[in-house]
Structure formats: C-alpha cells, structure tokens
C-alpha cells in the first residue's frame, strides 16, 4: 500500500512539474531580448502560420517591414485571400506599429487595401529572430479569463522564400511549444500566385 501511495505522489509531482513548465498565460510568453528593429527591417516570407478567427491571408505571403524617416515602423504585406468562398485574389495589407516599453512588443494598427478585408489593432510581438534567417511573431486578439489566449495568430518568417534551414526549424519548433501553439501551424506555400518583388 505504501508503495502505491509513494508511486501516486511521484506521478502527481511529475504531472504538476509538467503543467508548471508549460504555462500558457500570454503575459508569461518571452519575446526577443534586445530587439533591434533596424536589423529586423526588410522583406520576410511567411513559411508557416497559425490562423486566427476571420478572414486572413492564406498563402504567398510576403511582408516588408520599414523604418520611416521619423523612426516609426510600418509594414506592407501581400498574399492570397479567398472572399465569399469563391473569389481568390492577391490582397495588400498595411500596418503601422505603435511602440511599447518592450522593443519587441508592438501594437499594430492594420487594414486591408480592400474594404472587405480585416482591420484592427493587434499585438505584434517578435518572439525570436536571428535577423538573417528566421523570425517568429505572435499576436493574441482575445484572452480567456485565466490569461490564456482565445484567438491568436502567429507567423514563421524566412528571409529565403524557399524556407528555413533545419537548425532554424528546430529553434522555431521550440518557440512554438513555448507559445502553446505546437502542432497548430500550417505550411504557407509560395507558388507564384502573388508577386513577391
């Protein structure tokens, strides 16, 4: 009997440590330390993404982050969308970034060039990047009462339209797990449907 109780206590302790290790409250997610927006600027290609609720870019997504003369960060993105379940087209999105106390945590005000496309003000957190190969971003649109995210989206970006090297993929997978989004991403194809230049 004592062995069973001891085994149960060990199992409960292990379970508790696993749950504590995977804390999915948004405020506990780590972002890029010492983020440098000048190094981050330029063209990034989405190679994977976790979708939010609502109409969103599907594939062939390229984003261009720019530092304006006044120091503000802006972005344009282009990608394929499907409207009314039938019509497919390449859509342009425009974003303006509002800086916060943490350089890697922006608020992004965005809108589509077409009125039917999404518009809003979302978090835009740079979770990790090496500036030359990969970047992973995260946004939580709505939170649950317990602080976890109810509606989020995330992009894995590459400087190379053909994807990420295996070493970068391993880093990105670890970060996806830390965001509690492991196995929630889908591959973003680049088949020439939209111009990326």
UniProtKB/Swiss-Prot annotation:
The keyword Aminoacyl-tRNA synthetase does not apply. Residues 1-20 form the signal peptide. Disulfide bonds join 24-180, 90-194, 140-149. GO terms for cellular component: extracellular space. Pfam families: Lipocalin. One of its GO terms (molecular function) is retinol transmembrane transporter activity. InterPro entries: Calycin, Lipocalin_ApoD, Lipocalin_CS, Lipocln_cytosolic_FA-bd_dom, Retinol-bd/Purpurin. GO terms for biological process: retinol transport. It comes from the Eukaryota. It is found in: Secreted. Keywords: Disulfide bond, Retinol-binding, Secreted, Signal, Transport, Vitamin A. Coiled coil: none annotated. The keyword Ligase does not apply. Substrate binds at residue 118. Belongs to the calycin superfamily. Lipocalin family. Retinol-binding protein that mediates retinol transport in blood plasma. Delivers retinol from the liver stores to the peripheral tissues. Transfers the bound all-trans retinol to STRA6, that then facilitates retinol transport across the cell membrane. This is Retinol-binding protein 4. The lineage of its organism: Eukaryota, Metazoa, Chordata, Craniata, Vertebrata.
């Amino acid at each position: 009997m004592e062995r069973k109780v001891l085994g149960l206590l060990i199992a409960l302790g292990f379970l508790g440590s696993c749950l504590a290790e995977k804390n999915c409250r948004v405020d506990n997610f780590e972002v890029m330390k010492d983020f440098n927006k000048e190094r981050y600027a330029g063209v990034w290609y989405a190679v994977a993404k976790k979708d939010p609720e609502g109409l969103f870019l599907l594939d062939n997504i390229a984003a261009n982050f720019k530092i304006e003369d006044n120091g503000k960060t802006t972005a344009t993105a282009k990608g394929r969308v499907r409207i009314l379940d039938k019509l497919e087209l390449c859509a342009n999105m425009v974003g303006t970034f509002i800086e916060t106390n943490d350089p890697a945590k922006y608020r992004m005000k965005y809108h589509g060039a077409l009125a039917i496309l999404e518009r809003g003000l979302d978090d835009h957190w740079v979770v990790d990047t090496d500036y030359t190969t990969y970047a992973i971003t995260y946004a939580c649109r709505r939170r649950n009462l317990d602080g976890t995210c109810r509606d989020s989206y995330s992009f894995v970006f590459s400087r190379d339209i053909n994807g990420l090297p295996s070493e970068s993929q391993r880093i990105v997978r670890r970060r996806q797990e830390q965001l509690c989004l492991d196995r929630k991403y889908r591959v973003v194809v680049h088949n020439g449907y939209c111009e990326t230049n």
